[in-house]
Amino acid sequence: MSSIPFDQKTISLLGMKMDTSDFYTFADRWLFSTNHKYIGTLYLLFSIGAGLAGLALSVIMRMELASCGDLILNSNYQLYNTIVTAHALIMIFFFVMPALIGGFGNWFVPLLMGAPDMAFPRLNNISLWLLPSSLILLLLSSYVEIGAGTGWTVYPPLSSITGHSGPSVDLAIFSLHLAGVSSMLGAINFICTIKNMRLKGLTGERLSLFVWAVLVTVILLLLSLPVLAGAITMLLTDRNFNTSFFDATGGGDPILYQHLFWFFGHPEVYILILPGFGIVSIIIQAYANKAIFGYLGMVYAMLSIGILGFMVWAHHMYTVGLDVDTRAYFTAATMIIAVPTGIKIFSWLATLFGSYLKLRTPLLFILGFLILFTLGGLSGVVLANSGLDIAFHDTYYVVAHFHYVLSMGAVFAAFAAFYHWFSIIKSFTTYEPHEWEFVYNPFELRKKIPYRRTDFSYLETAGILHFITTFIGVNLTFFPMHLLGLAGMPRRIPDYPDAYLHFNLISSYGSFVTLVSTIMFFMFGVVFNYNLFINGFPSMFYIIKPLIKITFFRIKQIIQGNNECLNSISKELTILILHVKRLSKLSVNNWSIA
């Protein structure tokens, strides 16, 4: 790419012409920013894009599983496994972690401590820009040769040179390395910020629970990621340099990889959910209008979860031949984790008890979180039993369990935080310096900004509709999976006997409902405010019509085996995009972040 001549007056960027001075201002403000608010906003935008890609992959899987036999993948089972791998890695490393830690963490950890910025602003910037590079490598791994169809665990010997001979797994490993470096740099930054940049007098007992949650999370990252890096580096040398760390024919052991991976993998689960715990605490505190019940107990519960998270990794490995004493220990240790988690759940309920609650969108998502996360935890207690897990291992019961914890735990917390902090994030450059003390003063529960405009609020009705449709969609998708797992349906298999048809069909319809609710979230809840909703109603009608047609009628045709309708879908998508572009012109004045 050639550099821009200094005498050139205009430049074309993404099809738009702008003055070079405007371009340099844009680049300096966004691409090279050291401001934690700009970087946090970019993290959120990146996670939204990655989340949509992950959602699209999951819908493709559910379309394939909507009926017995082959529907859309033409018996290409390797492609199905590649989609499974990409979906998992994208959702974990490029959606949940950038949104909860990079996005909301960067935005609000300094504000909740009274800090001017993060401790290392340039480190903050590079930890952001490593993520798009990592995502590109992961997407390339899916396109190179047969793709990386190993599952997100990348177990050898399937991931070895005999199982995947092409460079696809190598690219996926490099992608994980880059994402790990990004997370490590961010973790160092957060630890230094929280330790050294608090307001004078803001001791640990007065720190926000969200800051505590982020602190425990980044300590877990700092301790667990080097183990993953070592495991995948050994796998890389096994594949390319003739070592035999995980090759039994050369004296290695594939079970060693499983121990190393899950020593990272189980703390990773808590890394994903702990920032969500902090968000739940903040929103419940705001809507109950009182301090969280048992503050110190909540802090110690998070610390206990972090410590115990490193002591239970082998409950993912009950089927590999562990001796009975080892299985007894890991069963007991896993069940003990339910104690601090239960303390947090009951403390939140005790805070809500007796409060006058206005059921706004953020609180609805938090209540959904409490119900569904608890259900997911109960199925986790079942899986903790080493005897029962022999039957449930690698079935859809496990898929249902961790999606109840993540899809309805971490993601519900992210939606709640987005709605709760929406006006601040969208209008942060419009606040005067003296107004920030009203936005977040760590010593006050909440204050209203006097005479503040409400131009940047979301549509409450649209938010509630988004919650209801999402709640119905995710439960329709994942609850039948418990029953499929109990009946013995294995995961990561694109075909199944017709005895499993009805529950799979319900699950697929649930994923389509979730897809529609996500589209509604972008159309009505985020991008457009009330005035635009009224002025742009005719254009919205033209958007909704092809959307309904694609969602219900075309998908039904695909399920029935009519693949000729794919051309019609592409035409309808083209029409849809044209109308979205037309409508976006109406929203230009309402959708400027800076």
UniProtKB/Swiss-Prot annotation:
Keyword Magnesium: yes
UniProt binding sites for Fe(II)-heme a: 87, 403
InterPro entries: Cyt_c_oxase-like_su1_dom, Cyt_c_oxase-like_su1_sf, Cyt_C_Oxase_1, Cyt_c_Oxase_su1_BS, Cyt_c_oxase_su1_dom
This protein's pathway: Energy metabolism; oxidative phosphorylation
Pfam families (alphabetical): COX1
Function noted in UniProt: Component of the cytochrome c oxidase, the last enzyme in the mitochondrial electron transport chain which drives oxidative phosphorylation. The respiratory chain contains 3 multisubunit complexes succinate dehydrogenase (complex II, CII), ubiquinol-cytochrome c oxidoreductase (cytochrome b-c1 complex, complex III, CIII) and cytochrome c oxidase (complex IV, CIV), that cooperate to transfer electrons derived from NADH and succinate to molecular oxygen, creating an electrochemical gradient over the inner membrane that drives transmembrane transport and the ATP synthase.
Name of this protein: Cytochrome c oxidase subunit 1
Organism field: Physarum polycephalum
